[in-house]
Amino acid sequence: MFGPILIFDSGIGGLSIFDEIRKVLPDQDCCYLFDNARLPYGELEESVLIKGCVELICEQALKIDASLVVVACNSASTLVLPGLRERLSIPIVGVVPAIKPAAKLSIARHIGLLATPGTIKRSYTRELIEQFADGCKVELFGSSELVMLAEAKLAGESVDLIKLRAQLEPIRQSKLDTLVLGCTHFPIIASEMQQILGNGVKLLDSGVAIAQRVVFLLNEFSLDKVVDNRTKNLTAIYTTAEISAGLTTRLAEKGFTKIVSRSSANLG
């Protein structure tokens, strides 16, 4: 087994990536670090986002001697990867919206990207569309409200379908046939989204591709960090003083045995 993987997100959206990684690496140690004190990232100034993310990720990666870092956040991935690669010598995996497979899959040649406002406005996103969706009509939809709906669901609350329907109405009206979920929070409410959009709209995310990339990189670059540890270690660290009982329960159900605030974590 390899040394621990550090998975980072602004909130619980990265758990959609964690779930896919666990399917292919069920015995792998993981540390899930979520910066819920600054949620949602899609509305932060770029300089603030970059500085905070790089500091948090580097601090924790060094503490746990991580084999690999997954930035399981689209908003952060568009900005922080260069800074991380300057400071860390381990592989860094970011999340890229699934524009390329969506363009190949769309029969109508009409796709949508649903992401946070920050991801929607970045030049990186426009470059992806220009490179991989040539010949397709691409519509962009930004929403921070869906991030909070996903957070609420994982904390044990029912999804507010009225709010969700209002957020998705422009997509329903667009008549597209393929929708890219460009935020790792969104797969958490994918079943509710499918219910509203109907089966005529295919939903795509990057979770499986990220998990496959992680496996490849661990085998390719991390052989020097193989450890002998028969006890799985799944740790979740948050940046607020506390989290809800509902979220604590959901994290425990996913196998996390240590769930602590960054201020009280003793992982060094």
From Swiss-Prot:
<dbReference type="InterPro" id="IPR004391">
    <property type="entry name" value="Glu_race"/>
</dbReference>
<feature type="binding site">
    <location>
        <begin position="9"/>
        <end position="10"/>
    </location>
    <ligand>
        <name>substrate</name>
    </ligand>
</feature>
<keyword id="KW-0573">Peptidoglycan synthesis</keyword>
<feature type="active site" description="Proton donor/acceptor">
    <location>
        <position position="183"/>
    </location>
</feature>
<dbReference type="GO" id="GO:0008360">
    <property type="term" value="P:regulation of cell shape"/>
</dbReference>
<comment type="pathway">
    <text>Cell wall biogenesis; peptidoglycan biosynthesis.</text>
</comment>
<dbReference type="InterPro" id="IPR033134">
    <property type="entry name" value="Asp/Glu_racemase_AS_2"/>
</dbReference>
<keyword id="KW-0133">Cell shape</keyword>
<dbReference type="GO" id="GO:0071555">
    <property type="term" value="P:cell wall organization"/>
</dbReference>
<dbReference type="InterPro" id="IPR018187">
    <property type="entry name" value="Asp/Glu_racemase_AS_1"/>
</dbReference>
<dbReference type="InterPro" id="IPR001920">
    <property type="entry name" value="Asp/Glu_race"/>
</dbReference>
<dbReference type="InterPro" id="IPR015942">
    <property type="entry name" value="Asp/Glu/hydantoin_racemase"/>
</dbReference>
<feature type="active site" description="Proton donor/acceptor">
    <location>
        <position position="73"/>
    </location>
</feature>
<feature type="binding site">
    <location>
        <begin position="184"/>
        <end position="185"/>
    </location>
    <ligand>
        <name>substrate</name>
    </ligand>
</feature>
<protein>
    <recommendedName>
        <fullName>Glutamate racemase</fullName>
        <ecNumber>5.1.1.3</ecNumber>
    </recommendedName>
</protein>
<feature type="binding site">
    <location>
        <begin position="74"/>
        <end position="75"/>
    </location>
    <ligand>
        <name>substrate</name>
    </ligand>
</feature>
<comment type="function">
    <text>Provides the (R)-glutamate required for cell wall biosynthesis.</text>
</comment>
<dbReference type="Pfam" id="PF01177">
    <property type="entry name" value="Asp_Glu_race"/>
</dbReference>
<dbReference type="GO" id="GO:0009252">
    <property type="term" value="P:peptidoglycan biosynthetic process"/>
</dbReference>
<dbReference type="GO" id="GO:0008881">
    <property type="term" value="F:glutamate racemase activity"/>
</dbReference>
<feature type="binding site">
    <location>
        <begin position="41"/>
        <end position="42"/>
    </location>
    <ligand>
        <name>substrate</name>
    </ligand>
</feature>
<comment type="similarity">
    <text>Belongs to the aspartate/glutamate racemases family.</text>
</comment>
<keyword id="KW-0961">Cell wall biogenesis/degradation</keyword>
<keyword id="KW-0413">Isomerase</keyword>
